[in-house]
Amino acid sequence: MNPSDYAESLTIQLRKGFLVYCVLLSCSKQEQYAGEIVRRLSDSELMVVEGTIYPLLNRLQKYGYLLHEWRESEQGPPRKYYSLTDSGFELVDELKHRIKMLNSSLKDLEKGVN
């Protein structure tokens, strides 16, 4: 595999790894329905595959990090709006901290510092 293709493959894996954090972070700012989350992540070039969002939202609800509320829509059927639970906000803070630590470690490694 050439370096460019391999780098693209690794980038896809990194995006998948960050997807939970990105979804939670997006919902931490305001309640959103799945289409808004997908659009926001797509605009940020963070979306891996649209079909991964719905199972992820269900999993985050199952684990108690998200809640949903059905709301009528002016355009089309009712929409399911997602918001974070207290545990969801705690998870966002924990992930933010760990990502900063990883970023710092990578910067140190690039500088040649242990």
Regions found by a protein language model. Name each.
Residues M1-I12:
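Short, Lys/Arg-enriched N-terminal segment that forms or immediately precedes the first helix
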Residues T11-T52, R71:
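N-terminal helix-turn-helix DNA-binding core of bacterial DNA-binding proteins
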Residues E31-A34, Q61, P78-R79:
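A generic structural signal for ordered secondary structure
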Residues Y54-R59:
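Short, hydrophobic-biased segments on the C-terminal half of alpha helices
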Residues G64:
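Glycine-centered, phosphate/nucleic-acid-interacting loop/turn motifs that mediate DNA/RNA or nucleotide
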Residues E74, P78-K96:
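Basic, amphipathic "hinge/linker" alpha-helix immediately C-terminal to the N-terminal HTH DNA-binding motif
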Residues E90-N114:
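Amphipathic alpha-helical dimerization/coiled-coil segments
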